[in-house]
Amino acid sequence: MTRPIWMGDEPPPDRPPTLAGRGRLALRGGAMALVLMAGLTLHLAVRLIERPLHGGHRPWTPAITPVVCRICVAILGLRYSVRGRPMQHIGAVVANHTGWLDIFTLNACQRLYFVSKDEVADWPFIGWLARATGTVFIRRDPREAKAQQALLEDRIRDGHHLLFFPEGTSTDGLQVLPFKTTLFAAFYTHGLDKVMQIQPVTVNYTAPEGEDPRFYGWWRDMPFATHLAKVLSVARQGAAEVVFHPPLDVSDFPSRKDLAAACEAAVRSGMGQRSR
């Protein structure tokens, strides 16, 4: 897998799973794979009926993903909590990005559609899963900028809560990188700023007892398979907390840079403030 890389500090050294760890890896990994495949099969079956009747509106299939992700979080054994409430208004969500685990922790508590770099569509299994669940893929090509802008606008007006990671990469989970403002421009076209809100969200992870505080972070050139195996094989998981901040009216901010700065400040304010 290739992805924009944040270098940060040197990651903790990899440790091969113990014999017991391999057993946990097999049990958790196998169970999660079965749940994901069952959820994807159900999603595709429902979509076959939903698409002819509703087109891009997707009134039924978004309810499947949170259930699947909640089951996966439970299988993983991650202690999971939520503060605040997901917004109901038309709009988008922005969050800090720690790694692949965000897919489960963020989807488990609300109906979302991820906005991702186009190369993710080619990743084994994950790309297939992302396409099936309505992920919006963005290509770094100026010639396609207008078409992609129109796609984002259409999805938002259809009531889809699109999830952006404005840091542009994943981190060690202990900090928030400066937000890139480019994608915020999508919220200022064709009067969209007059009708939509942005909800900043902070995802906090607590490492398992005795592990490096950056345990759940995925950065530098860490291999996906190695990191996945490390998380699945640990004896006792840590915790994840999703913090929903008050939604922001886009119309209150004169420019994308002002809006991005306000969202970044909100996300930063929730870092490390885990409830007990």
From Swiss-Prot:
GO terms for biological process: phosphatidic acid biosynthetic process. It catalyses: a lyso-ornithine lipid + a fatty acyl-[ACP] = an N(2)-[(3R)-3-(acyloxy)acyl]-L-ornithine lipid + holo-[ACP]; a fatty acyl-[ACP] + a 1-acyl-sn-glycero-3-phosphate = a 1,2-diacyl-sn-glycero-3-phosphate + holo-[ACP]. InterPro entries: Plipid/glycerol_acylTrfase. Keywords: Acyltransferase, Lipid biosynthesis, Lipid metabolism, Membrane, Phospholipid biosynthesis, Phospholipid metabolism, Transferase, Transmembrane, Transmembrane helix. Disruption phenotype: Mutant lacking this gene is unable to produce ornithine lipids. It is a single-pass membrane protein. Its EC number is 2.3.1.270, 2.3.1.n4. It is an enzyme of class 2 (transferase). One of its GO terms (cellular component) is membrane. The chain crosses the membrane at residues 25-47. The keyword Transmembrane helix applies. It is found in: Membrane. One of its GO terms (molecular function) is 1-acylglycerol-3-phosphate O-acyltransferase activity. Pathway: Lipid metabolism; Phospholipid metabolism. Its main location: membrane. It comes from the Bacteria. Belongs to the 1-acyl-sn-glycerol-3-phosphate acyltransferase family. OlsA subfamily. Catalyzes the second step in the formation of ornithine lipids, which are phosphorus-free membrane lipids. Uses acyl-acyl carrier protein (acyl-AcpP) as an acyl donor and converts lyso-ornithine lipid (LOL) into ornithine lipid (OL). It can also act as an alternate acyl-sn-glycerol-3-phosphate acyltransferase (AGPAT) to ensure glycerophospholipid production. This is Lyso-ornithine lipid O-acyltransferase. It comes from Rhodobacter capsulatus (strain ATCC BAA-309 / NBRC 16581 / SB1003). The gene is olsA.
